[in-house]
Amino acid sequence: MTDLIGFYSDHKIAAPLAIAQRSAKFKPFAAEIARRGILQIATCARLEFYGEKSVLEDIDGKPFFGFSYGRVEGAISIAERLATIAAGVHSQILGEGFISGQLMQAIESGDPNLSIFKVARVAVDLGSAARKRQEFFAEFDYVQIVEDIIADRFSDKAPLDRIYIIGAGMLGQELIRGNVGERFRSTVVITRNPKKLRKRLNTGPKTNVTFMRPSEVGRTREPGSMVVIATTDVDNKYKAILQETLLRLGPRIILDLSSIPVLTREAIGELDYVNMYGDEFLRFIEQNNQRLAPKLPLVVSDIKAALGAAV
């Protein structure tokens, strides 16, 4: 397993938006890359490849053209990096819990008998355990961010309309389960295929959730509404449809939680638009990271000790 190597770039090395855009280009090829015996980690904040040196020789640097990137060699060094990623040490939001699930999805797409996937599975378990032992948990999550922005933007006594959620992947489902629409008249999930999505989410908790196509939204203006964008699965055609829909609706605020902003401030006119790269969102991250920074060396030491005991 000493022939294992890895190449990586993340938000610490390159501009976060640039990484998100490059990562998005590789996501559709995840299954194909996994079949080649390569562990690909393509998230909004990182693009990484791990595997046998003989398999990765022709990849060295190519996915990172125009970017700075790092290289790691050997099973132990790779396990340490993957474990610290799983613990949230390398996340933009320190201590966030999404990344371990994303890692497991990537691992499960590969051959469990290959060395790299065995190493990665152990690393995720060690990193997740260290995160729990050191209580390295983000002070807030996306549900909390949405709730804080609701409290700020809807502090008056004006009646609320509906909250609209675009996207029902991991993040969209978390927002629904977190009941962020509690203060609103109802929660609406905007989707191009209501029937399919309704069936997929049917096993979740019973909440006041309805499903609507974009064409059904905005038939009357709702100045007391809020829109949360929780997906990156938006091509140019769908983006134009959503833009037209939101201009008709006229919500009080549009909160874009996608790693690649779906809209621009110019496109939505005078509507209040907040995305993950704006000062308001970055303040949430800064406050969380300042609180958790003293725990970083403790988590890393914990992981190194656990790795030492495991080999």
Swiss-Prot record:
Give the source's domain of life in one word.
Answer: Bacteria
> Which SUPFAM superfamilies does the record match to this protein?
Glutamyl tRNA-reductase catalytic, N-terminal domain (SSF69742)
**Keywords, alphabetical:** Nodulation, Plasmid
Q: GO terms for molecular function, please?
A: glutamyl-tRNA reductase activity; NADP binding
Q: By its UniProt entry, which InterPro entries does this protein fall under? A: GluRdtase_N_sf
Biological process terms in GO annotation: tetrapyrrole biosynthetic process
- Answer yes or no on keyword Transcription regulation: no
Q: What does this protein do?
A: Responsible for the nodulation efficiency and competitive ability of strain GR4 on alfalfa roots.
Protein name, per record: Protein nfe2
**What would be the name of the gene that encodes this protein?**
nfe2
